[in-house]
């Protein structure tokens, strides 16, 4: 399936990881990253209320709709190996993270992830702090982040420092509002941000600028939809 053109959400990053042992540290770091970067990290697992029979189908959909995928191979988890193989098969760009403390004792010749790791670049971390630093570097290097920052630099020309700070926070909240759905009615998006103490005029102004820059599409009209582009 590699090489087949696929449609994906430009700012969505799939995260595959051991659910009980590794997920909590990622969720803590991601909560901070999503306040700073325009990326949405998609983690799918049992706690989402989905039964096991449908879980992998949902995971495959999330992988295929993501612009990039991160897999934490700490412990040689079989599910992570399976998800990695699927991402590789459909040509999703991917990165492997590995907890260095457990690497030697867990990644033996019998580990299910070992064949997938052969020859692949890995980001190793010994502490949660190092993991956070590596994930922040990853965020900065993503194509959508670069396009987003370029769009903001253009949109904020001539603004005061305080106005830039307010508008940057608004821009992040705009993309955060679109995390859970492919698109959102423009009117609902504006109302959502008005509830967070933003004026309709400033929301509309930034929507127009982001639309013109191509990082978010939102036409004008009663039934217009907004979506990440």
Task: List each language-model region with its residue ranges.
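Conserved catalytic or regulatory cores that recognize and/or transform ribose-phosphate-containing ligands
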Residues: 1-229
């Amino acid at each position: 399936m590699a090489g087949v053109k696929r449609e994906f959400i430009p700012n969505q990053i799939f995260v595959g990881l051991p659910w009980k042992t590794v997920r909590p540290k990622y969720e803590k770091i991601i909560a901070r990253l999503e306040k700073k970067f325009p990326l949405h990290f998609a983690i799918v697992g049992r706690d989402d209320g989905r039964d096991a029979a449908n879980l992998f189908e949902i995971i495959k959909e999330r992988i295929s709709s993501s612009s990039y995928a991160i897999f934490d191979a700490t412990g040689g988890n079989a599910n992570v190996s399976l998800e990695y193989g699927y991402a590789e098969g459909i040509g999703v760009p991917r990165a492997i993270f590995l907890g260095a403390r457990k690497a030697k004792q867990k990644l033996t010749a019998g580990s299910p992830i070992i064949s997938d790791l052969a020859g692949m670049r890995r980001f190793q971390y010994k502490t949660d702090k190092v993991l956070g630093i590596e994930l922040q570097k990853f965020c900065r290097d993503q194509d959508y982040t670069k396009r987003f920052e370029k769009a903001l630099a253009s949109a904020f020309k001539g603004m005061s420092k305080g106005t830039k700070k307010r508008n940057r926070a608004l821009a992040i909240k705009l993309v955060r509002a679109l995390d859970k759905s492919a698109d959102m009615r423009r009117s609902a998006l504006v109302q959502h941000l008005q509830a967070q103490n933003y004026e309709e005029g400033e929301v509309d102004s930034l929507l127009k600028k982001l639309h013109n820059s191509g990082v978010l599409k939102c036409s004008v009209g009663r039934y217009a939809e907004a979506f990440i582009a």
